[in-house]
């Protein structure tokens, strides 16, 4: 993880929308740094998708987030979705 990185946010989003997106980014960070509860991660992703319904924008945000943090949204999502466990982490997914 890189120290002191910025989150890729769209300034046209409302405060609530930014909170939803940040919540998902936090879940991704938690996936890499400790572990996440699968259900909560997927709920957070669903809320993120309501704010960012476009696949293209999701990929761009994912690339920007990975460049600044070193964490892949795509990899985290795929590993959590594929896991049959209640709690999932990057090193045990």
Swiss-Prot record:
One Pfam family per UniProt: UPF0223
UniProt cross-references to SUPFAM superfamilies, sorted A to Z: BH2638-like
Lineage: superkingdom: Bacteria
Entries under Gene3D superfamilies matching the protein: BH2638-like
Family, similarity comment: Belongs to the UPF0223 family.
Protein's recorded name: UPF0223 protein llmg_0515
Organism this protein belongs to: Lactococcus lactis subsp. cremoris (strain MG1363)
Upper classification of the organism: Bacteria, Bacillati, Bacillota, Bacilli, Lactobacillales
């Amino acid at each position: 993880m890189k120290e002191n990185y910025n989150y890729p946010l769209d300034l046209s989003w409302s405060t609530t929308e930014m909170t939803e997106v940040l919540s998902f980014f936090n879940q991704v960070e938690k996936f890499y740094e400790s572990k996440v509860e699968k259900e909560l991660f997927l709920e957070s992703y669903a809320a993120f998708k309501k704010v960012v319904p476009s696949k293209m924008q999701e990929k761009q945000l994912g690339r920007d987030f990975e460049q600044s943090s070193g964490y892949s949204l795509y990899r985290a999502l795929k590993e959590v979705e594929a896991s049959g466990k209640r709690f999932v982490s990057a090193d045990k997914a």
